[in-house]
Curated annotation (Swiss-Prot):
<keyword id="KW-0678">Repressor</keyword>
<comment type="subunit">
    <text>Part of the nascent polypeptide-associated complex (NAC), consisting of EGD2 and EGD1. NAC associates with ribosomes via EGD1.</text>
</comment>
<keyword id="KW-0813">Transport</keyword>
<dbReference type="Pfam" id="PF01849">
    <property type="entry name" value="NAC"/>
</dbReference>
<protein>
    <recommendedName>
        <fullName>Nascent polypeptide-associated complex subunit beta</fullName>
    </recommendedName>
</protein>
<keyword id="KW-0805">Transcription regulation</keyword>
<feature type="domain" description="NAC-A/B">
    <location>
        <begin position="34"/>
        <end position="101"/>
    </location>
</feature>
<keyword id="KW-0804">Transcription</keyword>
<feature type="region of interest" description="Disordered">
    <location>
        <begin position="129"/>
        <end position="175"/>
    </location>
</feature>
<comment type="similarity">
    <text>Belongs to the NAC-beta family.</text>
</comment>
<comment type="function">
    <text>Component of the nascent polypeptide-associated complex (NAC), a dynamic component of the ribosomal exit tunnel, protecting the emerging polypeptides from interaction with other cytoplasmic proteins to ensure appropriate nascent protein targeting. The NAC complex also promotes mitochondrial protein import by enhancing productive ribosome interactions with the outer mitochondrial membrane and blocks the inappropriate interaction of ribosomes translating non-secretory nascent polypeptides with translocation sites in the membrane of the endoplasmic reticulum.</text>
</comment>
<dbReference type="InterPro" id="IPR039370">
    <property type="entry name" value="BTF3"/>
</dbReference>
<feature type="compositionally biased region" description="Acidic residues">
    <location>
        <begin position="149"/>
        <end position="163"/>
    </location>
</feature>
<feature type="region of interest" description="Disordered">
    <location>
        <begin position="1"/>
        <end position="36"/>
    </location>
</feature>
<keyword id="KW-0963">Cytoplasm</keyword>
<keyword id="KW-0653">Protein transport</keyword>
<dbReference type="GO" id="GO:0015031">
    <property type="term" value="P:protein transport"/>
</dbReference>
Amino acid sequence: MDKEKLAKLQSQVRIGGKGTPRRKVVKKSVTSSQGDDRKLQAALKKLGVQPITGVEEVNMFKEDGNVLHFGAPRVQVHAALPSNTLAIYGPGQTKELTELVPGILNQLGPDSLANLRRLAESYQSLTARQAAAAAGSGGEGAGEAKEGEGDDEIPDLVDNFDEAEVKKSDLEELE
């Protein structure tokens, strides 16, 4: 070993005089998120917040039509009703309104319902334009294929209802 390396290592080993530890003690500092969390907890404690249990999800509707979604079970909600304060903990996700539609219809206010109608109209016009473009660019063959795809959603008639009605009346006469 070089004397330089040895001197460097020795200088790191002893950092003080007599009676001091020979190794450097690495102090673990409080991370900034823990420090912020402690400050937040202290501020909320001053407001007198109480935890609210049974919250499955929290949705905040933005003006641009998107939704800030906090999903369970990671959501913690604390409230101080006299000071009109709610604190929501957990990772939030920005989602489109259409992604959450079936589950949040009862949560929508008048503004959000207007946004939903606007989105539905734009979606309908978009699908109509796509169908027209496919029919126009593909010729008659593409149009027929498009009609066949649309028929998948509508069930085919199996029986004739007039004949079924006649059979039913015949059964009633026999009884």
